[in-house]
Amino acid sequence: GYTDGDIYGVEVDFENKKFTRLAGAVNRSAGSGFDGINAFGGRKRCNLTNDGRVAAYYGEAGFSTTGKLTQAVDRNPVGTESPDENLKFSAGTIVQVMVEQPKFYYKVVPLKTEKRTKGAITRKIRYYVSDTPKAGFKLHPAFIVNGQEHDVAYLAAFEGSLWDAS
C-alpha cells in the first residue's frame, strides 16, 4: 500500500460489502474531511457558455440556474485597463449549470476477480487518487480531449433527459 499523505484510496470488497479507507484517506471523516483535497473539495458549480467559457461560479453575482444569464457578467478584475471582451457576458447568454472538476490522477488495483465466459467480475479492488502525478498513476481520461491535457473538466450538475410529447 501507499503511505504518501497525498494519495487517497479505498479498498472495496464487493463480496463482503466492506469499504476500507487507505493511505491519506485513513482517519478522514466523510464529506468535510476531504474538502482540502483538490480532486474532491476543489469542485465548483459554474455557468458554462456553449463555447466553453465560465461566465459565473455559484455564489457570484450573475450565477443562474435558468439556462441563461439574467444579468450581465464581467469576469475582468475591477480596474482592468484593457478588459478582455471574452470575459464579458451579456444578460440572456445561454449557459449550462456544470461542475468544474480539477484534474486528478488515478490508479486501480484489482485484488480478486472471477473469470467468466465473456470477461471477468471484480470481487475486490483498490482505487487510488492523487492531485499530483505519481509513479504508476494515470491522468483521468476526462482531462484529455483530442490528445490535449486540461486542468479541469466540466461535468453535468444535474441529471438530464429528453422528452417528446408527440
Regions found by a protein language model. Give the residues of each.
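Short, compositionally biased
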Residues: 1-166
